Amino acid sequence: MDQNNENKKIMPLRYNEKTWLSGRIAETTGGFASHRGAQAYCLHFRGDGSAVWTVEAARQETFDLKLAYFAGKAAARVTLRLGSQTVCQVFPPVNGYASQQIPMRDPAMMQNPEDCESVEVVDTLTIPEGIREIHLQVETRGEFRVFYLELIPRSAKAAIEEKEAEAARLRPSIFALAQKGYGLFIHWTARTKPRYGEMLPYEEAVNAFDAERFARQAEEMGAQYVIFTTNHGSEAFPAPLTAWNKYHPGKITARDLPADLITALEKRGIQLFLYLHIPHMAGFPSDYGTSFNFTNTAMRDTAAQSEICGRICEMLEEIGLRYGEKLAGYWLDCWQPMVLKYGTDPTEQVYKAAKAGNSRRLTSFAFGVRCPTCTPWQDYACGETRVIGMLPKEGRYAGGQSKGYPYHSILVLDDDWWHDFYDNPIADPQYSADQLSDYIRGCMKNGGLVTVNTAVYQDGTVSPKTMDVMKLTKKRVYA
């Protein structure tokens, strides 16, 4: 490699699959362009600015293009330039889920959703062999973010489209579950705080967790299913898994809490999904900034990507075979670094491993609150929407982050996902039972799935105020 290029991030182009150029690997070259904070994986513009991606082409190829972006209150004019080739297009604000949101009462508590989308670019780029630069110029009067530029090789386009059609054919339908009612998302982890006093050590908390009481509580709240976190913010898993212990020694428990939850919930007709945090499961940094703070050598190390996916598959297969058909689904968090760091999508392998023991197990890969989904290999949208917003259209998202995917939205009812404060009560519900029930009924009518995230204390109990709202919601939804 040329010495002048050794400090750049240079993405090798693929010719039998898509290549993703994340905003993170672009070099900012002028104006109001930056990488910042929780959005470190994208390019952030607060006015006109420019950047450049560097790619390595093994041969000349023509690529179709898609740009994943967010536009604030004004459209942006985007120009892509490669040598003498120029592609110009205006990208307007996206009209998706967030355009009809009921904002959080306290925006500082967490991020309100924003509408981002992956949109086809009107023209192509022909990239000659060698190290090449794709220049990006953004003209905007407001805020504009570029998450990634997607390159689809013309020579393999038909095969890529057939693979995406296969992924769609393999999806189990969520319609029956959506028609039954809503679910609960419960962030109970090694970080969840008690109402009073100090936390129990993790394994003690697992042993003390009352699965029967938890299941009764879920039933009283009207849940048809529960998404239960296992390792959010932690490498611990609440069961004696051999593969997990292999990669995270000592981070398992003697008690099999998911098995006990399945038994208690099943008696009440409630299904169990498991949440898994991919960064901690895979053993790479969990926060976006650190996950994307990589070298050119690391970015090009697809062998490392394969090794990580192999570990994930091994753990998923053990979990899936252990719980079989009684484990209804997965919600796999923070998947975007696996695609956007390496520029290639390994999701198919992991998706198929997630079906071990239950070919109908519903599986979703989360790309964060503000990044368009870039894999066809999932059964339902992760739906990290947080607030009430646009209803589904024929069971799918009509626009925005998850456009075209089976509709699933998660509402954060009280605390910011989990209860993280000592000697403090869980926050009051931000939505009334009327607001919740109207939205849930609207989604059920249109084939969409809704999950309500309610914080719990370390003993697994919700706040009395949250329980009151959910009991009334249950009464109105199922009347």
Predicted stretch roles:
Residues D2-R59, K66-A479:
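Mature catalytic domains of secreted/periplasmic carbohydrate-active enzymes
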